[in-house]
Amino acid sequence: MEGQQPNREDRLLQEYLRTVKEHSCGLLSKIKMKKCFYFLSVAIFFSIEAIGTSAAIPHRIVIPDIDGYKTLKGELHIHTVFSDASVWPTTRIDEAMTEGLDFIAITDHVDARLLKQKNKGLMDFDRNESYKIAASAGKSHNVLIIHGGEISRGMPPGHFNTLFVSDCETIGKASDAHEDHYKAMKAGLAEARKQGGFLVWNHPHWERQAQNETRWYPEHTALYDAGMMHGIEIYNAFCGYSPEAHRWAMERGLTLICGTDSHVPMFLSVDFIKGDIRPVTLVFARERSLGGIREALDARRTAVFANGMVYGREEVLRPLMKALFEVSDVKYAEKKVTFRVVNRSSIPLTLRKAPGSEKIVYPRDMVIRPFEEVILTVYGLDNKKPIGLDEFDVNFAVMNFLIDVESPMTYSLHFE
């Protein structure tokens, strides 16, 4: 309405647009924009309409529910313009919805030194602003929004995410009160724990903080013993998979976590044209709700799906394999058995013949692509003769399902 005062979100967006315009040589004035845009880091950003057909539509991630639990797909580490990224919070919601995610945690840095727009005097906001904006948009887009933030310090102890908190302002101030990295982290995590937070050690293998080796320091033992480490990021899009973090998670009972840690629009970091998928944390929850996600994180019912690999505990990966690996149309003949296999997910399946099937012949190595349907044939050792077995097992090592470091899960089909 004419003369109506802009609300807080509109005012902040206008401040940021004005800032970007001043630093972009007038390019923004040539681009017609709405409220939810993709921002390029130095000032050029496009609305969905402006991108048009030049950008590929992201592939929606499809993964079936498992027995007794809903399979929720989400992002637990991502940034916006309210710390040091170039993306508006509502754009993160648009991305999540388009890619088929169920939840995201916007984890902007809570450290005062990393609130770049505020420090330059360009925008005025508190450290909960990105969550407030995202939570409002999430309701209309059916995306669950977890209130989170990232405490970023030198190594040790490094960076930690605080998830399911209520006030990032007090967490940031508690950390900012100390110059020593460990004392600052401990103070921030103590405040987050007081708020009921779920605490995650981020990217322990990030080369800027782990130049030559990935180490578990005495400071991490102290935080772990104090109940200030509940999960660990075993995959981060900046630095990939960490076998060390995976091993620590299994040894110490930490929840397996994944994050893109993205500071730019997703279409700049994920090649959707090639069909790539952003790394996600899979949460096996009793219900699709924030409470359901939190209960599953506490119970360690998670897996990481990244770069074609799935990392998780066997108690969730085995039912996941059962849910997505559909077998039907079994036909018995004297010399062979044929059956149809359908991959009901966005996860490729890399299969290798495993011990226990030495008396039958079937492909030793194969890949079943997402949603692909294949016919498999099993013969006896001499395909010109009857199989000669009353019953047998077709055993696979699922090479891209790791239930521990370098430990593929085995999966069997029984025929009789």
Where are these regions (language model features)?
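Short, Lys/Arg-enriched N-terminal segments with co-localized hydrophobic residues
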Residues: 28-32
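Aromatic-lined carbohydrate-recognition surfaces of secreted/lumenal glycan-active proteins
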Residues: 200-212
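A metal-dependent hydrolase metal-coordination microenvironment
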Residues: 58-202, 219, 234-248
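Bacterial N-terminal signal peptides
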Residues: 41-49
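Charged catalytic cores and adjacent phosphate/nucleic-acid-binding surfaces used
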Residues: 7-8, 54-75, 93, 157-166, ...
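Intrinsic-disorder-associated, low-complexity terminal segments enriched in Asp/Asn/His/Tyr and depleted
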Residues: 7-10, 16, 23
